[in-house]
Amino acid sequence: MNTNQSNPNTDLTDDANIEHTLHRLLTQANNHFDDTVKIDGQSLDLGKDLEQVMMDNLDCTDIFDSDIASQKHLTLESLFNDEHNTDSSTLLEMQRSANDSLVGIDLDRHKKGYTGKASLDKSTNQNNVHKPDKEQKNYKIDKPTIKKKKSLLKTTNEPMLSPASLSPSSSLASSDANESHLKIESMITDITSKIDSARQDIVSATKPAKFTNEFTISQISEMKARIINTHKLLLNFNFIKEGYARSCIQLKKSMDSLKDSEIHRAHLLVENDDLKQQILELTQKLNEKSSKES
């Protein structure tokens, strides 16, 4: 433990010493993990490592420390007002530190053999010994330690890897950092332009027309016209109702007359049959008389 704490200037020419130093610094930065959990270098999740590195960098930046010291209220307007004041070099430095941390995590993950196991044992022992110190510091990260970590990692001459290049479906190189930064700035400007346009629409809105006297007068005249139209509709309905009643009475009368005509027709048919019978009888009598005379 003492050798790990008192030897920050380890010879970086040796690959094993570099990996030991990287792992020690990363375990010191991530001192808020539970020491009781056994760490397996092969079972770590890349998403969790990326999230942890980004959180560490956000905690260690001077921008957020100055905001906290000045008790600045983080609102939507303050964030949009301060977007142009943010130094691009600070953002690039944050991305470089995140990339360097990811390089160290990747080296520890793919490392096999006794060296990786020994480094994990040393890191767990060191975390167990310094657990009271971590409780007193309220899990704060030491800034000099972060600066030492950055200086040691820069001397390794490893290529910088962006978070997008670590994903399996990505083919971006480390030179695309500036392009991603420009894309983020363009997205922020688009959002601010939309918010400004919405504010202008709200300010330029005039007084609603329903609170004016002209609108009240027009509503009264419209109500009068509706009342008159409703009265006309009622009169038309009554007229139609009376016409329907008259047509029903006439239909009843026509049905009665039709019934009477049918009865009269039946009587005429009966009388016609009687007359036919009488004619037949008379013709027979006439024929009989003519035969007797001859």
UniProtKB/Swiss-Prot annotation:
Job description of the protein: Involved in cation homeostasis and in the regulation of the cation stress signaling cascades. Also involved in bipolar budding.
Principal location class: cytoplasm
Residue spans of biased composition, Basic and acidic residues class: 130-145
Record's protein name: Protein ATC1/LIC4
Subcellular locations according to the entry: Cytoplasm; Nucleus
Region (Disordered) residue spans: 114-178
Transmembrane segments: none
Biased segments, Low complexity type: 153-175
Other observations noted: Present with 846 molecules/cell in log phase SD medium.
Gene Ontology annotations of biological process type: bipolar cellular bud site selection; intracellular monoatomic cation homeostasis
